[in-house]
Amino acid sequence: ESRNIRLQEVMALIEELVAQIPMAEKLLEIKGVGIRTVSGFLAEVGDISRFNNPKELQKLAGLALVENSSGKHKGETTISRRGRKRLRYLLFEVAMSLVAKNPEFRELHVYYTTRRLNPLKKMQSLMAVAAKLLRIFYVMLTKSVDYDPKM
């Protein structure tokens, strides 16, 4: 019981701290994104203004695309995985939540997996959705705009 009480105290403290961050409440308006996602994202990324573009943020998360090629061999394109593992895991978890709860992201996932040209496997699609969410977070935090599903 004392562990549950301590956990509730820590979560209350996290909610207080997130409430102090400008634009954090805007991120919570996205259906499927919760306080743990926002607090984890902000803790891992830090000051968003140090990034010049969303590609730098994708690289930090290890979601940058790299091609496995050498000489005449052209291999598959995969994510680099050379970033922060916890941030990538957090984004993957929220991508699953978004695909389940948010109609815009579900539609995007269905499109990625069923498109005629280069359909993605389910895991690849979830990583693409995670990268999309990362770009949305970047735009919302740097430009101080509200969430627009057409973003």
Would you name each region that the model predicts?
Residues 1-151:
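A detector of single, family-specific signature residues
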